[in-house]
Amino acid sequence: MWWRSNHTALGRLVRWAAVAAAAALTAACFQPLYGEHSPSADGSVAPNVREALATVQVDQIAAQSATPEARIAVQLRNDLIFELTGGTGAGTPANRLAIKMRLSKTAMIVDIATGRTEAEIVGIDVDYTLTEVGSKKVVVNSQTFARVSSDVPGLQQRFAHQRAQRDAEDRATKVIAEQIRSRLASHFVAGT
């Protein structure tokens, strides 16, 4: 055909060569986050991320006793411990994680005829600080949040409403635990 020529074949070959060269040059730049014994910036072998995360001691989260916030605080702490240790138990504490939590609930959809909430958003805002145990130096100070929606069933289904709220709160604590784990993992790998 008239549009195919040696010129386009040569261009295609040059493009493939450029892609192969770029791949070869950047191949050593990437490492798995949870890989075994990742090399650190100075070339020495750093402990892997799983081992570093397992050394984080999660402090109790302050909440008034016998309130929904207390249950959510316990759930968040349990989710964090599981995310950091993988369910295997903690190592010797090298870092402490202190958490301050705020809970909010907002009506998302309201029936205009009855004034009843049909869907709501459960929000959890968290401020957290990672401190080295030995030096008491703050190494990470950050915030995160989660917003999760839940449906509110009819007035006759009180237990279903409580379960929907609890499910939304549990999903929000899981999201926050995963976000904190990811942030701490990036700190242990890159020091950021």
Regions found by a protein language model. Give the residues of each.
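Surface-exposed short loop/turn segments
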Residues: 87-143, 149-167
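Conserved acidic
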Residues: 68, 72, 118, 164, ...
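N-terminal, post-signal-peptide region of Sec/Tat-exported proteins
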Residues: 70-92
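A structural "domain/chain start" motif
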Residues: 2-19, 27-78, 189-192
